[in-house]
Amino acid sequence: MTTVPKNAVAKTLYQKVWDAHVVATPEGEAPIIYVDRHLVHEVTSPQAFSGLKVAGRKLRAPEKTFATMDHNTSTRSASLDALSPMARTQVETLAQNCKDFGVRLYDIHHPNQGIVHVMGPELGITLPGTVIVCGDSHTATHGAFGALAFGIGTSEVEHVLATQTLRQLKAKTMKIEVRGHVSDGVTAKDIVLAIIGKIGMDGGTGYVVEFCGEAIEALSMEGRMTVCNMAIEMGAKAGMVAPDQTTFDYLAGREFAPKGEDWAEAVAYWQAIKTDDGAVFDAVVELDAADIAPQLTWGTNPGQVVAIDGKVPNPLDEANPSTRASMEKALEYIGLSAGTPMTDISINKVFIGSCTNSRIEDLRSAAVHAKGRKVASGVTAIVVPGSGQVKAQAEAEGLDKIFIEAGFEWRLPGCSMCLAMNDDRLEAGDRCASTSNRNFEGRQGRGSRTHLVSPAMAAAAAVAGHFVDIRKPY
């Protein structure tokens, strides 16, 4: 918290960043805000670039636009021949658009290519106090740095490319404080799943959430990114964490971070970007970190989640008719019975990756449970690093060998099995322990059954063949 000068209005982190970016407030219309960084990929950008060409427009600030290929790329081969006809068209179109408009592109052959929400932060493109947008719903990831980051639609992508601005209504503010410290075996993924389980998948609708408290402050930047990544899964517009020394240490020396005197000046500014003492939030949610156990979803949205030592809930215990019906529908799709212990649920697929959990810390955590073990019979497990940098670092540490020797598949960077868009997808009836962010019906493939977990929980399930409590011997 920061102290407010006398007679000044106390502001939240979000309000400070918002106010610093309002360009104009036309009467009767949504405010116009400035965009500092625009991230694009091959799926949501083609129509936007086409619109610019039809209108004869150029990019307002091509140096503030960064492109990568991630959603529809192959994790088996870096060759265009490995792509489906549609995927190949998408990546080739992005390459041509970037060439035509002067946009920096990290294509499938670039050593820094990766998932947009992984490679952006590790290159220092993501900075505190900035506004960042991308045609992707999990852009909130970048809020871990104290940035205001959110997903936009394709028409908005075109608007930002042309003007470097965006019309936006100001959101309400929510503080989610996680007090105290977590126990061994509990990760950032468990924290955010517990939060969503508490407030529901629509509990954050209309809000920008600031995550705070000792448990959040103790997280690495990788952990904070995991938490902010899933802010959208509680319905929030964005998630943010105030920048601190952990943030500055992570950013120091990265390619697009300030250098020299600019660095010192930037840090001085960033240190002031935090919620003031006395600032009032529109809503406050509190959790005790000590109460959080490793989490595991049982249904078809991230809010349908319980602790690993719990059981599949019974819809009959739910008083709300709408919620009860939703639970019944979820159980029918997911193929589970009420009262089943979570540790009795067997799996046949494991996916460790996605913009939620594919960073080096995530892979290290999973490798602990893979080392010296073997993937269970009948289980297929894949590990997909989030970027070329993550892959190279993991291989330098020998993590790839640990996974391969245990029977995991070691892949190339990309969004992979998070969504059934590329070749990495589940078959009908497959049950997957996944480190991704969504467990909707068909998300990983038609008829697929997804259980969201941390990387450690996913790796443990791979070797056990079923979900286990990683806090105990298994």
Curated annotation (Swiss-Prot):
Any one GO molecular function term: 3-isopropylmalate dehydratase activity
Organism from which the protein derives: Shewanella sp. (strain W3-18-1)
Record's function text: Catalyzes the isomerization between 2-isopropylmalate and 3-isopropylmalate, via the formation of 2-isopropylmaleate.
Cross-referenced InterPro entries: 3-IsopropMal_deHydase_lsu, Acnase/IPM_dHydase_lsu_aba_1/3, Acoase/IPM_deHydtase_lsu_aba, Aconitase_4Fe-4S_BS, Aconitase_4Fe-4S_dom, IPM_dehydratase_rel_enz, IPMI_cat
Annotated metabolic or biological route of this protein: Amino-acid biosynthesis; L-leucine biosynthesis; L-leucine from 3-methyl-2-oxobutanoate: step 2/4
Membrane-spanning parts: none
Binding residues for [4Fe-4S] cluster: 355, 415, 418
GN (gene name): leuC
This protein's name: 3-isopropylmalate dehydratase large subunit
EC number: 4.2.1.33
Cofactor note (record): Binds 1 [4Fe-4S] cluster per subunit.
One GO process term, biological-process aspect: L-leucine biosynthetic process
Subunit annotation: Heterodimer of LeuC and LeuD.
